[in-house]
Structures are given as C-alpha cells and as structure tokens.
C-alpha cells in the first residue's frame, strides 16, 4: 500500500487474475488491466473460476458430511444446521413454486448456499487473499479478486444458467407452440384475426424484453450490491494506509460496522437470487399467461 497511490490500490484490488492470449502471441497471465482487455472474449478469470469451484466443493463436502453423520437419534450441531436450512428452502419453494418438479428444491438450495458462500468471502479482510496470492506466485504485482460475485462474468453466468432452465421448462410444459404463443399473443389480443396479426410484433417486443430482463436483473442485482460492498471495504482499507492516526482509528470503527451490516447484505442477496429463480421457474411451469 505504501508504494501505491490510493487510486492504484483500488484498481489493483478490483482487477481479476486473467489468463488468455497475450499480444505477443503466447498464452499467459495479464499483469495489467490493459493486457487483460486486449485478450478479448476468450480470457479466463482464474480467481473467479477457482473460488467458485472451491466454494462449490466446500458446499458439497459439508452437506455430504451431514448426510453421512445423520442419525434418527439425537442430531449433532451440523445435522441440525443443515436440517434447518433444508426446511427453510423447502418452505420457500412450497410457498412460491406452483408446479410439480423434484428439481426445484435442490436447485434452490444449491443456489442459496453457493451464492452465500461466494458472497461471504467479502468478509475476509481485503488484503489477506491478494497478499497470499502474491506470496504463492512470487509476483508482488499480481492482481487477485477474491469475491466471485463482484465479477459480472460470474453473476451473468449463473443468471444465464437460470435463463436456460426457464426456456427449457417453458417449452417442456407449454410445448414449442405454446411458448411461441406466449411471446406473440399476449398481453394484447383481439378476436379479429387481422388485428391480432398486427399486434404480434408489439406483443413479441414487450414479451421478449420482459423475458430477457429476467437474467439481466438477476445478474446485475447481485453484482451491483456485492461490488459496492467490496468497494466500501477497499475504501476503508485506504483509510488504514493513510498514515493518519485519527483516520486509521475511524477505519477500524467503520470496518467492524460495515462488516456487521454486510452480513445482512450477503445473506439477503443470496436469498433474493434464490427466490427470483423459484418465481421465474414457477412462471415457466404455468400453462397460462
């Protein structure tokens, strides 16, 4: 921090560890934001991918341990926690999902826990994980963004997966004709076939925008809230590195206050992502508009 300006410090913490095709024709890691940008579409955010997979495996291992230790007698703390979580998600699905599917509840549970774990990385002090990456790599300038949900590629990827399920179940339940009819015959209709034909482009435009808005809103809502939260933590860290005693003291107070408040944010954002997924899939299972 001492060798960086506040602006450089912030930019460094908001840059991903990117692997891709370098300008010299070789494959490797980008060391600057400009190099990462030049890599284009086929660049991989290694930090986002690594943390997403690692946290997904942690989720699977925790629930596998709970399942193996499950007993009909006196349950342990882990079993109690998992049962409460499963009951909570199952209740949310029963309240909001009006179709019949054995997939929705496990999907909702996976989304909630996985997104929560990715969000929770934001509670780790902002310098710890990047400094660990520097020690492992031996590169003092290597960028490393630790929170996957502050990367729009991660949130958009999850949202597009949900969107694919929306399209799949819409066609499965309503048929291809019903799905096309839903996009072209609503919200405006007429008994006159000629008028109805004229309304098809208007209906399609409105319904298509509504359909596309679902994954975009899912992705941007999660990304925006988590990115803003991470930026606040980074700005507080800048206070610590200011060299001014009173500003560092204020940073300590703000760090703890924001961390406590942020626990609510990371939980709420995971819950909202899960609930919107349930609602969107419930709408896809409805055989009427």
From Swiss-Prot:
It is a multi-pass membrane protein. The chain crosses the membrane at residues 43-63, 101-121, 160-180, 193-213, 232-252, 259-279. It comes from the Bacteria. It is found in: Cell inner membrane. GO terms for molecular function: proton-transporting ATP synthase activity, rotational mechanism. GO terms for biological process: proton motive force-driven plasma membrane ATP synthesis. Its main location: membrane. One of its GO terms (cellular component) is plasma membrane. InterPro entries: ATP_syn_F0_a_bact/chloroplast (IPR045082), ATP_synth_F0_asu (IPR000568), ATP_synth_F0_asu_AS (IPR023011), F0_ATP_A_sf (IPR035908). Keywords: ATP synthesis, Cell inner membrane, Cell membrane, CF(0), Hydrogen ion transport, Ion transport, Membrane, Transmembrane, Transmembrane helix, Transport. F-type ATPases have 2 components, CF(1) - the catalytic core - and CF(0) - the membrane proton channel. CF(1) has five subunits: alpha(3), beta(3), gamma(1), delta(1), epsilon(1). CF(0) has three main subunits: a(1), b(2) and c(9-12). The alpha and beta chains form an alternating ring which encloses part of the gamma chain. CF(1) is attached to CF(0) by a central stalk formed by the gamma and epsilon chains, while a peripheral stalk is formed by the delta and b chains. Key component of the proton channel; it plays a direct role in the translocation of protons across the membrane. Belongs to the ATPase A chain family. This is ATP synthase subunit a. The gene is atpB.
């Amino acid at each position: 921090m001492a060798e960086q300006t506040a602006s450089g410090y912030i930019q460094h913490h908001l840059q991903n560890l990117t692997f891709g095709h370098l300008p010299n024709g070789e494959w490797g890691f980008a060391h600057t934001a400009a190099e990462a940008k030049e890599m284009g579409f086929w660049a991989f955010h290694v930090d986002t991918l690594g943390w997403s997979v690692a946290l997904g495996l942690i989720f699977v291992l925790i629930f596998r341990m709970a399942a193996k230790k499950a007993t009909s007698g006196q349950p342990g703390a882990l079993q109690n926690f998992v049962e409460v979580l499963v009951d909570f998600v199952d209740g949310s699905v029963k309240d909001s999902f009006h179709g019949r599917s054995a997939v929705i509840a496990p999907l909702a549970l996976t989304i909630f826990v996985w997104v929560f774990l990715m969000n929770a990385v934001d509670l780790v002090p902002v310098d710890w994980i990047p400094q660990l990456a520097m020690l492992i790599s031996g590169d003092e300038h290597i960028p490393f963004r630790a929170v996957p949900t502050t990367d729009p590629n991660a949130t958009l990827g999850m949202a597009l997966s949900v969107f694919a399920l929306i399209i799949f179940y819409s066609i499965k339940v309503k048929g291809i004709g019903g799905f096309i009819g839903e996009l072209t015959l609503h919200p405006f209709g007429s008994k006159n076939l000629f008028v109805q034909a004229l309304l098809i482009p208007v209906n399609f435009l409105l319904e298509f925008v509504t359909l596309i808005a679902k994954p975009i809103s899912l992705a941007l809502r999660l990304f925006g809230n988590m990115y803003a939260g991470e930026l606040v933590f980074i700005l507080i860290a800048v206070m610590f590195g200011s060299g001014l005693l009173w500003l560092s003291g204020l940073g300590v107070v703000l760090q703890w206050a924001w961390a406590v408040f942020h626990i609510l944010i990371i939980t709420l954002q995971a819950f909202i992502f899960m609930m919107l997924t349930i609602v969107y899939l419930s709408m896809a299972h409805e055989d009427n508009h």
